[in-house]
Structure formats: C-alpha cells, structure tokens
Amino acid sequence: LDEPDNYLDVPGKRWLEDQLRATQKTVLLVSHDRALLARAATRIAAIELGAAGNTVWVHGRGFATFAKARQERFARFEELRRRWDEQHAKLRELMLMYKNKAAFNSDMASRYQAAVTRLAKFEEAGPPQAVPLRQQVSMRLSGGRTGRRAVVVEQLELTGLMKPFDAEIWFGDRVAVLGSNGSGKSHFLRLLARGGSSPEPGNTSVDHALIDPVRFTGVARLGARVRPGLIAQTHAHPELIGRTLIEILHRGDDHRDGMGREAAARVLDRYELAKAAEQRYDTLSGGQQARLQILLLQLAGATLLLLDEPTDNLDLESAEALEAGLDAFEGTVIAVTHDRWFARGFDRFLVFGADGSVYEADEPVWDEGRVARSR
C-alpha cells in the first residue's frame, strides 16, 4: 500500500488502521502518518541514505520505539567509527615509527614490514558502516507583527457548505481546522487567502497561485498588516511550471525580491532542495513541491500562514522541521489537517461539524461524520 491514508479524513484513517490490524495477510505499507504507523505497524523498515547507495534497516518493533532505537543505532555507528579511527591512527603511527628506525637500524626492517602488513590488512577490512545520511531540513519562518485581531468572522456562511458562524483569531494563535472531507474547510482557507470578504490593500495574498473564488455571506475580515499565504493541498502553481528552482528564486516576483544564485543555493540547501536546484518545478516529488511552497512563503513575508493538509506529502524529517518552524514563527497559523500527530502542536481547534455547524473545541475532535447534504 503506497500512502493509502493520503486524502483520508480521520474516520477513514481509523477504518484503515482497524483493517490493517485485523488482517492476517502480510502488509507492506508506505506511510508518513505517524499516528497511523503508531497504531498499525508492527515493524518499521526505514530506507537510509548513504554515499555508496541506500540501504534498508528494519526495526523489529513498532513506531513508538522507532525514533529512540534509530538514535541509539546511529550513536553506536559513531562510536564504532571513533574507535576505528583511533586504532587506524595507532597502527599508522607505529608503522611510521618503525620506518624511521629501520632507516638507521637494519634489525628493525622486519618489524617495519610487519607493521606495514598490519596496517594494510586493517585498511583493507575497511571502516565500520558509516552513519546513514540524515536530512537536515531547516524551515526558518519569520513572519512579523500584525494587529491583535488577525481574523474576525461574523455570521460567515460558506454557501451550500456550512451554517453561519462567528470566530475571533488573535495574533500568534495556532488554529487547527478539523472536520470530515467535504465539510468546507479548504473553502474557508481560500476565502481568507483572497483577503477575506472585503479585501484591503494591506491584506494582499503573498501567493501567486490562482485562488478560486468562494461563495459566502457574512464577514471574514483580516487585521492590520495581516498578509495571508496559502499552501494548497494540490501544490498547483501554473506560473511555476517549466521553471527551475534556481530560476524561481533568482527572478523573484511581485511579493519577494530575487536573489543571487549563491544565496538561492544556500536557502535551497536548508530545505534539502539543493540537489534539485536545476530541476523544473513540475518534475519535483510531492514532498519537494511542498517544501518549496513553504520556502516561498518564508521569502514573501506572510504573517498569516494558511496550510491545507501541509504534512500530506512530507516525510517524517520534513514534518518535524515544519513543526519546529511553526513553533518559531512570529505570526498566526491556521491549518486544515487530518494529521493527529501534527495537531498536537496547536492550541485552538475549529471544528466543522457533521450537522453543518462550526464550533471551537478545547482539544482535537476527530469523530465528526460526513455532512449530510440535500441532493
């Protein structure tokens, strides 16, 4: 199963987890959903990057112990390499000592040859397995100060989707938007990304992607200096197709300055995109496109991050880097998510309910069913 949980809401994910736990069949599952892995996987096979090629390490237990076991494994590799380097230095030092002595004392020639042989055999056996290469993704999301009220919603109704609701979102809030598929969550983000119900010049989106209009009644108002930036679930950016990553950063656009190629290469490296610098945007993997979108929001100076399923295409290291970046972000974050692990980092939860209502909860609510609509 290759990412079978993508595009599933939480009831769908739970159903999938129950099926995986119940089946007697062998299941090989590719997934980056940490909650699903914790509930359903009994062993973890990790593809590890290496200079000489990738390898697979199998952790014989579940996801709960995976991170600690991998950290301990890497520490063992580092210790073995340290010991090998020490022994190699001693053998080389011994060989050089006998070499110097043999130059003045022929009786030392045999000892010198023995030392040369020992060193050669040691080097031929080679060092222990190298520590696997790890992704070093660093997402530096800066943001900026805005008015205290970042978003004010008054009797907002997403036509044909949800009933009217009110909400106030304050500067610095981390709001997770929860609910089943098709409940209107993405429409809500799109409305905010377009500047709200009556966009002001200071609320212009930093995102160049064409954002489809949303039918609504009521008010959705953005605060002073709130500049929304949207990461859509599909990463569709027609204006980037056919352009390389270096070209995108070098030329800039209306919302961000261009940068020199060396500076562009450095910032791509922080997002583990340096090797893809000369690739066209449309040839990138879903995870690479997602990381680039986050990078572009960083460079454009968004102060309101609107994230639609941001972890769907991110591997574990990138998801953790995003979480760290959001923790340090000076601004407001509103994220639609079905990622139960990711939602732990949020402090407010706006739930789109099965009855068409929108309400705030003190903790994540994952059991809302599909909205019943007249047909």
Question: Where do the language-model regions lie?
Answer:
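ABC ATP-binding cassette signature C-motif
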Residues: 1-77, 139, 145-375
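Flexible nucleotide-interacting loop at or near the entrance of a catalytic core
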Residues: 73-164
